[in-house]
Amino acid sequence: MAKSATIVTLFFAALVFFAALEAPMVVEAQKLCERPSGTWSGVCGNSNACKNQCINLEKARHGSCNYVFPAHKCICYFPC
């Protein structure tokens, strides 16, 4: 009985050891820089339309309506 408990303990210790050695894969997020849309005119009230325009016309990664004094503007997000 003691021998089987020792084997189980050693097996568990080896499992923990190998799990500790396994390095998790970390994917670094790409930093995005923002700038006002060059193709949007007027006040931005529809973030989905802004996003589509930024992606399709300006080749940005993302777009959204953000408040930039004095009104909401379409802001596009590009890789820095």
Swiss-Prot record:
Residues with the modification Pyrrolidone carboxylic acid, per the entry, are Q30
**Annotated tissue distribution:** Expressed predominantly in siliques and dry seeds.
Signal peptide positions are: 1-29
Q: Which GO terms describe its biological process?
A: defense response; defense response to fungus; killing of cells of another organism
Looking at the record's lineage, which domain of life comes first?
Eukaryota
Query: Where is this protein localized, as stated in its record?
Result: Secreted
Oligomeric state and partners? Forms oligomers in its native state.
Biological role: Confers broad-spectrum resistance to pathogens. Possesses antifungal activity sensitive to inorganic cations in vitro.
This one is known as Defensin-like protein 13
- What organism is listed for this UniProt entry? Arabidopsis thaliana (Mouse-ear cress)
